[in-house]
């Protein structure tokens, strides 16, 4: 069973106004028992790609999941991220473990950021990309991410509950 506790690590550069309302949103959507928000103390330089000027998102996810012994962990970072084979990613997730979300391309828009966090946490809870109008729709650009729904479709909602 996936933990019902969430620990959010926030890049200290990110304005608190960006994450106002995030805690209530995540409790409503995912029914977390507890959410703890704290500033990220250190981002490992080993995850930084100097040629690309981006963080490798899977490296960040491995790092934060090794630092948090129990529960789901979410890193919200201000820098750009990528994974092998893609120019950039809004985020990356691992089922039952946690997620990394970069706000670099999300225009400092709290609703846009919540949408991408909801998407990545959907993956943490086992959801795949969805082809219906849904927050789980794959986005390959800022435009596509902007256009997708802010909530789960009925199919994904049912899958989350099972």
Predicted feature locations:
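The catalytic-center signature of Zn2+-dependent metalloproteases
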Residues: 105-162
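Fold-level signature of zinc-dependent metallopeptidase catalytic domains
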Residues: 3-16
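Short, Lys/Arg-enriched, disordered terminal segments
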Residues: 1-6, 159-162
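A structure-centric signal for secondary-structure junctions around beta-strands
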Residues: 3-5, 70, 95, 150
